[in-house]
Curated annotation (Swiss-Prot):
Domain of life: Eukaryota
Name this polypeptide is given: Cilia- and flagella-associated protein 161
Gene: cfap161
Keyword annotations: Cell projection, Cytoplasm, Cytoskeleton
One GO biological process term: cilium assembly
Chief subcellular location: cytoplasm
Keyword Cytoplasm among UniProt keywords: yes
PANTHER family: CILIA- AND FLAGELLA-ASSOCIATED PROTEIN 161 (PTHR24274:SF1)
Physiological role: Microtubule inner protein (MIP) part of the dynein-decorated doublet microtubules (DMTs) in cilia axoneme, which is required for motile cilia beating.
InterPro entries tied to this protein: CF161
Pfam families: CFAP161
Source taxonomy: Eukaryota, Metazoa, Chordata, Craniata, Vertebrata
Length: 301
């Protein structure tokens, strides 16, 4: 009996039946989730495909901003010592922010509240386009005037029609990096979603009050409740699945002359009348880049 082998690799020991059953159940659950598109990699892929879908911007024939226009909010950056690159107000979301209601047969869409950031991609898409909404009964097509209240809403469909909102900062609610006043996209529309456009030059601000807002020109976007202006912070970086982005807050940065700094200068970017697939700012930047290249070639020759 001393030479009899009582064990070989084919012998199952321990709770082998439970282990086999658990492995089979895990495999079945994985296949079921894959068929329903519920795997994390599938959700992230579907999110990027939906949120980066191109969107056509509005064309301003008269050069003014109108209620109902689809625009991008662009901070042109700073060419000085700060070297802040241009950025666009954009949605920050992941797969946990996507929901669908099978009971009402609606497709997947974003669920608020969501973060926003300053993305560097200038291509108009679901993520960075917003609709100008009236809050005082003005009809679509009417011009937006300086110091007139309005709201910013994401596009319909996947973007979920969320509203850009802000409120006074507190210990529990503030910007993640800078600890300044937080910006977010919310589902409920109230006074926290009201904004107004101010003329960027404080010396001429009173004279321009009530005049139509020009598109593709520098303006200030002020929050009606807190009187803080939309700002891009290049010294506070947010990392998302879309890359490195600037933190955006509602905070007014003043220089020694009590004038708002470049952090607070924004423009409503619309489409070029001749090429609606691109924004007017994109075409201007491409022309500027081509001119710089031509100048460098001439200097070298």
């Amino acid at each position: 009996m001393a030479h009899v082998r009582t064990y070989n690799p084919r012998v199952r020991v321990g709770n082998w039946k439970e282990d086999v059953t658990l492995e089979e159940e895990t495999s079945k659950e994985f296949i079921l989730q894959k068929d329903r598109g519920e795997l994390t990699v599938q959700k992230e892929g579907a999110l990027k495909q939906s949120i980066l879908k191109p969107v056509s911007l509005s064309v301003s024939q008269d050069g003014f901003l109108h209620f109902g226009d689809t625009v991008m909010l662009v901070n042109c950056g700073d060419g000085g010592h700060m070297q802040r690159s241009p950025c666009v107000l954009s949605i920050i979301a992941d797969s946990s922010n996507v929901t669908s209601h099978s009971q009402t047969n609606t497709g997947p869409h974003l669920l608020g509240p969501l973060q926003v950031g300053g993305a560097h991609s200038m291509d108009p898409c679901v993520r960075n386009t917003f609709i100008i909404i009236s809050v005082d009964g003005s009809s679509d097509g009417e011009v937006v005037r300086y110091d007139q209240s309005f709201a910013l809403k994401t596009t319909g469909g996947f973007a979920g029609e969320l509203f850009l909102a802000s409120d006074h900062k507190s210990f529990q609610k503030c910007a993640k990096k800078s600890r300044l006043q937080e910006l977010s996209l919310v589902e409920e529309f109230d006074f926290l979603c009201w904004w107004k456009v101010l003329y960027f030059d404080p010396q001429d601000r009173l004279e321009n009050e009530g005049y139509p807002v020009q598109v593709n020109n520098k303006v200030l976007i002020s929050h009606c409740k807190t009187n803080q202006c939309l700002a891009a912070l290049s010294n506070h970086i947010l990392w998302s699945q879309f890359g490195k982005e600037y933190e955006l807050t509602a905070h007014t940065f003043l220089d020694s002359h009590k004038a708002e700094q470049d952090n607070n200068h924004w423009l409503f970017s619309t489409a070029h009348p001749a090429n609606q697939s691109q924004s007017l700012l994109q075409l201007q930047q491409e022309e500027h880049k081509e001119n710089q290249e031509d100048t460098q070639v001439k200097d070298c020759s």
